[in-house]
């Protein structure tokens, strides 16, 4: 992608979050002429500290916040859009109509990277699978860099010139502005309703996810999820993965062999389900996806086997917290959408006598009907919190006990009263946390702290 760094007209970086600041550092190092904008009037002190450091290094950089200057945007050579700023923003659309090129940090990264890139997206499981693939490569002795939507912004990964493989978690927000991904391996794990406050429909959200496929050399997709099926593209290798569905014989595939209880690649068992340390049916699917990706990316399977045997899961993703009076407490605060919560409930069902679910928060415009069906099938009681608690309650059948709590602290204590020995208290909100907390991590920490207060 030639000449992504314009010199005759200014580049405008929109957004001063983690990604926007990484773009600004990258452009400053290139000696580019650029503006740094943000729509927010009030920015954190830490942001201004980083901006001051950038201005000291790049005095020509201009900064503005509180609104988007249409005249500046429409006269720019390029706009580098941060993931938190929708492509549909009116000022951005005006610039696009004026012929301004709009790109994201992924485009800048791909234009400069020297090593193969694996990109992983999906409504849920992408952080876990990205971590597993990264660990597999590391265990195999490769110099691997992991980042994107998880941890380090992609442009910061370029600092190490000796990287042999990049493994990136990519969100729909990041993929919106990608012109052509051109990944070596591209994977969509699953698609379920999320960010319906940003996308007009599930179809639009799905289209954003599938942008990861365009230009990819190899594609990995979920045979059980029709929304992940890629378009037919000549010369592209396809890998399907599934825990229960058969495939066409001419397609590469990773399946669960029920006869041997093993994960198999193209009909050959690779390793046992018993090798997977992280629990739940949803994590079995994550392992299947990781195996398909490792094969596509030429990562030795021994590295993945070690990762699966040792990896205990990420914080706030179906994380075991405690067992008190025979009741298990699991923190799945990262379940910020319906699909993720459903995966946790279905994946853990059958391992406990009953599930007492804590759910609720900001549903981001989601339709909770499908969640209601899963709750009605697997959950004995629900404690609801947050602004969208009434919407969830509306889809829960009367036979499922449903109570509301004003705080998460109160919800945990209420759930502890409802649970008996052999039961599970599961925090899997199916909602964002911003109506009550700074982020899902803060919500998860509050859950763990309150569990510690519950009488042993």
From Swiss-Prot:
Cysteines paired by S-S bonds: none
Per the UniProt record, the source organism is Saccharophagus degradans (strain 2-40 / ATCC 43961 / DSM 17024)
**Where does this protein act, in terms of pathway?**
Cell wall biogenesis; peptidoglycan biosynthesis
Q: What is the lineage of its organism?
A: Bacteria, Pseudomonadati, Pseudomonadota, Gammaproteobacteria, Cellvibrionales
Q: Which Pfam families match?
A: Mur_ligase_C, Mur_ligase_M, MurD-like_N
Write down the superkingdom of origin: Bacteria
According to its UniProt entry, the function of this protein is described as: Cell wall formation. Catalyzes the addition of glutamate to the nucleotide precursor UDP-N-acetylmuramoyl-L-alanine (UMA).
What gene makes this protein?
murD
Q: Which family, according to the similarity comment? A: Belongs to the MurCDEF family.
One annotated GO molecular function: UDP-N-acetylmuramoylalanine-D-glutamate ligase activity
Q: Does the keyword Acetylation apply?
A: no
Gene Ontology cellular-component terms for this entry are: cytoplasm
State the compartments where it is located.
Cytoplasm
For ATP, which residues are the binding ones? 122-128
- The principal localisation class reads cytoplasm
Swiss-Prot/TrEMBL catalytic activity: UDP-N-acetyl-alpha-D-muramoyl-L-alanine + D-glutamate + ATP = UDP-N-acetyl-alpha-D-muramoyl-L-alanyl-D-glutamate + ADP + phosphate + H(+)
Which BP terms does GO give this entry? cell division; cell wall organization; peptidoglycan biosynthetic process; regulation of cell shape
Q: Which UniProt keywords apply?
A: ATP-binding, Cell cycle, Cell division, Cell shape, Cell wall biogenesis/degradation, Cytoplasm, Ligase, Nucleotide-binding, Peptidoglycan synthesis
What is the name listed in the Swiss-Prot or TrEMBL entry for this protein?
A: UDP-N-acetylmuramoylalanine--D-glutamate ligase
Q: What is its EC number?
A: 6.3.2.9
Q: What class of enzyme is it?
A: ligase
């Amino acid at each position: 992608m030639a000449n992504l760094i314009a010199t005759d007209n200014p580049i405008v970086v929109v957004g001063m979050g983690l990604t926007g600041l990484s773009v600004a550092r990258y452009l400053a190092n290139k000696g580019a002429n650029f503006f740094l904008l943000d729509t927010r009037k009030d920015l954190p002190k830490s942001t201004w500290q980083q901006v001051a450091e950038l201005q000291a290094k790049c005095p020509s950089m201009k900064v503005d916040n509180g609104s988007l200057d249409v005249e500046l945007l429409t006269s720019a050579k390029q706009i580098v859009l941060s993931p938190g700023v929708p492509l549909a923003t009116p000022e951005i659309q005006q610039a696009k109509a004026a012929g301004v090129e709009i790109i994201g940090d992924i485009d800048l990264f791909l234009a400069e990277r020297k090593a193969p890139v694996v990109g992983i997206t999906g409504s849920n499981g992408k952080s876990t699978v990205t971590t597993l693939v990264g660990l597999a490569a590391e265990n195999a002795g490769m110099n691997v860099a992991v980042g994107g939507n998880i941890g380090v912004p992609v442009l910061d990964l370029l600092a190490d010139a000796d990287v042999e493989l990049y493994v990136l978690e990519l969100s729909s927000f990041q993929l919106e502005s990608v012109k052509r991904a051109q990944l070596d391996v591209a994977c969509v794990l699953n698609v379920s309703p999320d960010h319906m406050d940003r996308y007009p429909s599930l179809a639009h959200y799905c289209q954003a996810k599938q942008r990861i496929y365009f230009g990819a050399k190899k594609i990995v997709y979920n045979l059980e999820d029709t929304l992940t099926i890629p378009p037919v593209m000549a010369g592209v290798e396809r890998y399907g993965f599934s825990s229960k569905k058969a495939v066409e014989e001419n397609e590469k595939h990773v399946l669960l062999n029920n006869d041997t209880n093993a994960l198999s690649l193209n009909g050959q068992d690779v390793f046992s389900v018993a090798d997977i340390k992280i629990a739940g049916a949803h994590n079995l699917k994550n392992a299947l996806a990781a195996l398909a990706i490792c094969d596509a990316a030429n990562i030795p399977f021994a590295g993945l086997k070690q990762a699966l045997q040792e990896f205990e899961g990420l914080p706030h993703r179906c994380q075991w917290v405690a067992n008190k009076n025979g009741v298990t407490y699991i923190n799945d605060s990262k379940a910020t959408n319906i699909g993720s919560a459903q995966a946790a409930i279905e994946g853990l069902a059958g391992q406990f006598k009953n599930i007492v679910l804590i759910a609720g928060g900001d549903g981001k415009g989601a339709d909770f009907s499908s969640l209601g069906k899963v709750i009605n099938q697997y959950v004995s009681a629900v404690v609801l919190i947050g602004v969208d608690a009434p919407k969830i309650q509306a889809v829960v059948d009367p036979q499922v006990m449903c109570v509301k709590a004003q705080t998460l602290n109160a919800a945990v204590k209420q759930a502890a009263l409802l649970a008996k020995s052999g039961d599970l208290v599961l925090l899997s909100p199916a909602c964002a946390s911003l109506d009550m907390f700074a982020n899902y991590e803060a919500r998860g920490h509050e859950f763990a702290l309150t569990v510690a207060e519950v009488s042993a």
